[in-house]
């Protein structure tokens, strides 16, 4: 799926995208979607000590502040399937992926045109991290020419 999305954008096609925006990792006011890594065992020293003293509610608030780039989860097909099977991921919104962007920490994002009209802070555009798109995508629709050749061949297109 991600190969199709990336190939479409690399070849000047947009992607119609069905996703789940009822997630904690999606902020309408900040116009961003992320999947923060909650298992921060790689922390050391004072960071680990400070994190260890936070309550569960405080940890969640820190993860979803949306104030700076942070570490995100590595998404697997098993995670996607489990989220679908237990109804954690549902198809509740459609948008159009227009392009890509990179944040100040070098993390990849997709620039997405929302159907809610022109709204701040980015005039109706939102930025979804690569892990968010990999995790919460329900469907994509692309021009068949946007599909990578090996996949097109397997599909008989």
Language-model regions, residue ranges each:
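Active-site signature of cysteine proteases
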Residues: 1-157
């Amino acid at each position: 799926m991600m190969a199709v999305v990336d190939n479409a954008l690399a070849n000047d096609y947009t992607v119609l995208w069905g996703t789940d925006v009822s997630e904690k990792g999606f902020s309408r006011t900040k116009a961003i979607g992320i999947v923060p890594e909650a298992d921060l065992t790689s922390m050391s020293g004072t960071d680990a000590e400070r994190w260890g003293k936070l309550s569960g509610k405080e940890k969640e608030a820190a993860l979803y502040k949306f104030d700076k780039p942070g570490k995100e989860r590595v998404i697997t097909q098993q995670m996607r399937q489990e989220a679908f099977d237990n109804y954690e991921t549902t198809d509740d919104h459609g948008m159009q992926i227009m392009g890509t962007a990179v944040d100040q920490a070098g993390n990849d994002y997709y620039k997405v045109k929302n159907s809610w009209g022109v709204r701040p802070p980015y005039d109706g555009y939102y930025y979804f991290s690569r892990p968010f798109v990999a995790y919460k995508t329900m469907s994509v629709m692309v021009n068949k020419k946007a599909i990578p050749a090996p996949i097109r061949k397997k599909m008989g297109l």
